[in-house]
């Protein structure tokens, strides 16, 4: 939580972007966790870049199966099925109406890329209801593409979600094809600190969603399985204390240094001038786009 809090508070020690990223859109490149790429804040814009990463993975697998680019952590074994790299693209249900998402789905299906599209369907698109935004849910929508496996689950059921996602991840690692998971989930909080739930949602709608709050569902299931109330309280108290400590430390962490604002904007390059022989020599110059055609 501490690293995410640094990012949320735009602190200089933020390992994602040094405190210069749109909040709650973290990215990460450490060896101890899955890589999270940088994304735009525009709705659905993560779909095309993540599909591009999946395309890159497929290309690397075909051209250089043992590339170091695949390595993650100290136990990587490229020949092991459970170590085959995959991509996960997380989306909200309303974002599926965006053109970029359709492009990504089309491309992933056409080229059979190792990507999972995880759609969290809470029936809202920021302040717009599903009835106002779309005709079908993501699972129904993706049927038209072909080549993409799909499944719908109760995303408020932790056990079901864990089991299904494990199976989906295993299948995509093994079969190397795209998969869409449509998880029906409640909307319990605000969209952002500025788009607050009480601005556009009725008490009846909120009450309906609270019935599917996954936390009490999981708590009830754990007690049925024999976990004691004391054990649960101990976990909750320890977690709350850890979060409070991390937050206190994040609040007092140093701010970004103004003089470093231009760092890492451009990738350093040693190529600063044109060198070499043009072929054919003295040929008429053409536009790059025309040459490609």
Feature locations, PLM:
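Short internal beta-strands
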Residues: 112, 116-120
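N-terminal amphipathic, basic-rich helices that act as targeting or association modules
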Residues: 1, 283-293
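A general structural motif
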Residues: 127-137, 211, 287-290
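Acidic, glycine-rich active-site loops and adjacent beta-strand->loop/helix elements
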Residues: 91-97, 119-125, 156-159, 185-187
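Cofactor-binding active-site loop characterized by glycine-rich and histidine/acidic residues
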Residues: 1-76, 81-111, 129-139, 143-146
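Glycine/aspartate-rich loop-and-adjacent alpha/beta segment that forms the canonical ThDP
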Residues: 171-278
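Conserved thiamine diphosphate
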Residues: 58-61, 135-167, 210-237
């Amino acid at each position: 939580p501490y690293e995410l809090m640094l990012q949320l508070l735009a602190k200089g020690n933020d390992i994602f972007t040094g405190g210069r990223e749109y909040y709650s859109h973290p990215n990460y490149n450490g060896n101890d966790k899955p890589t999270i790429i940088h994304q735009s804040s525009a709705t659905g814009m993560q779909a095309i870049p993540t599909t591009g990463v999946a395309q890159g993975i497929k290309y690397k697998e075909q051209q250089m199966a043992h590339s170091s680019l695949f390595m993650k952590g100290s136990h990587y074994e490229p020949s092991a099925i459970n170590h085959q790299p995959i991509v996960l693209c997380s989306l909200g249900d309303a974002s599926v109406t965006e053109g970029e998402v359709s492009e990504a789905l089309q491309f992933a299906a056409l080229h059979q890329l190792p990507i999972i599209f995880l759609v969290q369907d809470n029936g809202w698109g920021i302040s717009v209801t599903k009835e106002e935004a779309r005709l079908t849910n993501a699972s129904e929508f993706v049927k038209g593409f072909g080549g993409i496996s799909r499944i719908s689950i109760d995303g408020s059921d932790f056990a079901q979600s864990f089991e299904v996602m494990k199976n989906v991840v295993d299948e995509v690692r093994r079969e190397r094809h795209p998969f869409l998971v449509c998880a029906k989930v409640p909307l319990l909080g605000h969209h952002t600190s500025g788009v607050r739930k009480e601005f556009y949602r009725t008490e009846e709608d909120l009450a309906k969603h609270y019935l599917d709050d996954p936390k009490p569902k999981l708590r009830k299931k754990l007690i049925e399985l024999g976990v004691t109330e004391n054990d649960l309280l101990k976990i909750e108290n320890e977690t709350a204390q850890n979060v409070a400590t991390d937050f206190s430390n994040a609040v007092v962490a140093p701010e970004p240094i103004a003089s470093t604002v231009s760092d890492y904007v451009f990738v350093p390059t040693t190529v600063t001038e044109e060198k070499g022989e043009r072929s054919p020599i003295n040929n008429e110059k053409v536009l790059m786009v025309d040459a490609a055609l």
